[in-house]
Amino acid sequence: QEYAAEEVVNAIHFIEEQTGEKFDWDAFFKSMKRFNAETEEFLEWMEISKTDYPQVMGVTLALYRYGVYQAAGGRNQAFLDMDKKLTKMALDAYKNKEMAAKEYRHRAMTWGVQAAYYTALPIWLLNCWGVVTIADMLSMVSTEMVNTEDKHQAMLDLAYLYENMIMRNRSNGGYETGVEALWRFCEMFNIDIVIMYVHMGCKSMSGYHGLFEEEARKHGIHLIWVTHNLMCPED
């Protein structure tokens, strides 16, 4: 962890040397406070998703979260303002026991290398089959807070988040984060179906194929493989 934090600091020093600019700790801590607040809102949605009346879910959760933690990163107040609006709407809908479909027959988790720009599948599953997608693999990262007082601890925390980003964690991070974590989320959200995406142009999780099937049987989880090659630049 110290090594990872050192690499972040080295990157900061390199940019300072090349540009002549100095790293603004005040601006950084301000962004991280906002980033932490965004994370807290997300965790609130996930608490609701553990119940029978999930609200922020499916592609609504997925596409929005990608923008929040990957692109905005606490730098834009508009995202936090929207987070708070979403939380209020979600809490109101939860209290009223509102549902996105007439019936939820199954609770699903999407895993694997998904097509972030192809949003029709979860909507089709919900409207035609009553399969509600509670959460997805790419949304379940960046859930830890960054220290906003101590510079060294802040670098350690930031490095941890970088270490646990999508391809460094789930798809290329090994058995514990790629396979074992899935079943923890299934238990957390009472999932009974896993939609396992297989990207024909990205084979990073293909070696786990048999392990996923074996573990799914052990946990009593239905596993559905969805092969795609969407949004591939070679096409």
Please report, for each region that a protein language model flagged, where it lies by residue.
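Trp/Phe/Arg-rich N-terminal binding region typifying the photolyase-homology
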Residues: 1-23, 139-140, 144-235
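A charged, amphipathic alpha-helical module
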Residues: 5, 9-146, 171
